[in-house]
């Protein structure tokens, strides 16, 4: 039997937990008894795969099996929670370009007050398989932060208050470790 487990090496066969020893983009061979009926599935904290029953009738044959884990509701909820906390923390930075954050604003004039950020709307979160890796992807989406700062014109010295929403676009890759730890990495255009 040749078992492919893209994006998560864990699966169950006939109720027994197994962890594939190969890269998630490869299939791992397993020796099984024939004839037999083998039920494959996956259930972890953040992922679930529908059961797949595979009959093996010919000794010595190679039967391909693909266990396709999908994000469950808890996965989306946890990623949304972690990213919201990240955005809120970014908004506490009193600079125009918050460090390691997806939003920021530049001015060609002089900034004369401390920038004040607030989150208006988080980007919507959907989680799909990353076509370029064995991880998960939050596709590019737009959120909005709000910035208030006083700006002085370099041309005539007039002072105005910039008090507007600042849209930002971001994507994320997500790796789910075998201990269910999430590693979320920002992707920018």
For the regions a language model picked out, list residue spans one by one.
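Short loop/turn and low-complexity linker motifs enriched in small/turn-promoting residues
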Residues: 1-189
């Amino acid at each position: 039997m040749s078992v492919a487990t893209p994006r998560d090496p864990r699966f169950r066969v006939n109720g027994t937990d197994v962890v594939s020893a190969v890269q998630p983009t490869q299939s791992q061979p397993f020796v099984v008894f024939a004839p037999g009926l083998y039920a494959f599935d996956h259930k972890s904290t953040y992922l679930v795969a529908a059961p797949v029953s595979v009959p093996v009738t010919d000794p010595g044959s190679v039967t391909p099996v693909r266990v396709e884990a999908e994000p469950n509701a808890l996965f989306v909820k946890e990623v949304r929670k972690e990213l919201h906390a990240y955005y809120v923390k970014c908004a506490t930075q009193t600079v125009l370009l918050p460090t390691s954050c997806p939003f920021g604003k530049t001015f060609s004039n002089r900034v004369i007050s401390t920038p004040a950020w607030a989150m208006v709307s988080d980007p919507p979160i959907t989680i799909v398989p990353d076509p370029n890796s064995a991880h998960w992807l939050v596709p590019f989406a737009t959120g909005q932060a709000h910035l208030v700062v006083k700006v002085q014109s370099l041309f005539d010295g007039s002072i105005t208050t910039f008090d507007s929403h600042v849209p930002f676009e971001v994507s994320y890759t997500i790796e789910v470790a075998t201990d269910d730890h999430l590693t979320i990495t920002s992707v920018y255009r």
